[in-house]
Amino acid sequence: MESRPLGGTDVEVSRIILGCGNFGGIGSAPEFFGQGESEEEAFWIMDAAWGLGITTFDTADAYGGGRSETMVGKWIASRGVTPGLITKTFNPMETGADHGLARTRMARQLESSLERLGVDRVDVYLAHEFDPDVSANELVGTFEGLVAISLIRAWGVSNFDAEQLRSLLETGTPAVVQNSYSLLDRADERGVLELCAAFGISYTPFGPLAGGWLTGKYKRDAPVPEGSRMAMRPGPYEHLRNEETFASLDRFAEIAAQRGVHPATLAISWLLAQPHVTAVVVGPRRPEQLEPALAALEHQLSQSEAEELAALFG
């Protein structure tokens, strides 16, 4: 699989990145720690991803309250291979525990992440959220210090809006921004993508299927499937439950059928066609869910085709 460099660094990531946020939990939500994929299921997914040429894995200290990093570390040790590793910090690892991007906390959290992963350094370390209590000078200084002592190779930010990213850029330039972006979530088109282009920052979106909405999983006047994002964490997607969205999704499914691909493949193809997208983070719940992402690498869209799909969703 093709790899691409991040920002101005020598770190490369595969065009499809394996998101490990469902290993041992559902993202960073404490109420779901211990749920999500079991270790056995996570191993199946990582085996499948590695076998398909996905060589970059994305996790975070708070995913599953540390369980995700632990599973990734055990898989690395058992398989004798080392994928490119991205991890993050900000969120608490227990209910009511500390959080944030203070220098001492980041150093402590990185040390524990390295221990769980069983490695001496990670390729990319991300601020998982913006911390209003930490100055840009402190944050950039912390990251640069970790690079200097070879605990990380590059750094970046996640879930930063345009204003937050702009304030950071007055002090330092991250190698990568990792935000939610899809045909149904285009907020980053209002500033973030422009800043990334202007400063040579790579962009690796997560949530390419908008919690399953772009796969056709959710139907009008029908209960949401058990175990789906809308069943477990509906908040980020509740605004999509309207007739306008369903009508656009109907047309999107028709276009996918005409092209002979799964809607998930078309959704990821659209992202890969965007000139500002370096790689796409996908978080499968089962190994077979990797197949639409791999198919998207071969299903290339022209600029006009990508623009037509974007117009479907405003």
Question: What is each of the regions a protein language model found here?
Answer:
Residues 1-83:
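N-terminal binding-site loop/beta-alpha segment at the start of enzyme catalytic domains
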Residues 25-30, 92-98, 214, 289:
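A short acidic, helix-capping loop that chelates divalent metal ions and anchors anionic groups
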Residues 35-49, 100-117, 161-167:
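Short, acidic/polar
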Residues 73-84, 114-118, 168-172:
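Acidic (Asp/Glu)-rich catalytic clusters
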Residues 82-94:
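A short, structured active-site edge motif that brings together acidic residues
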Residues 114-132:
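Active-site groove signature of glycoside hydrolases
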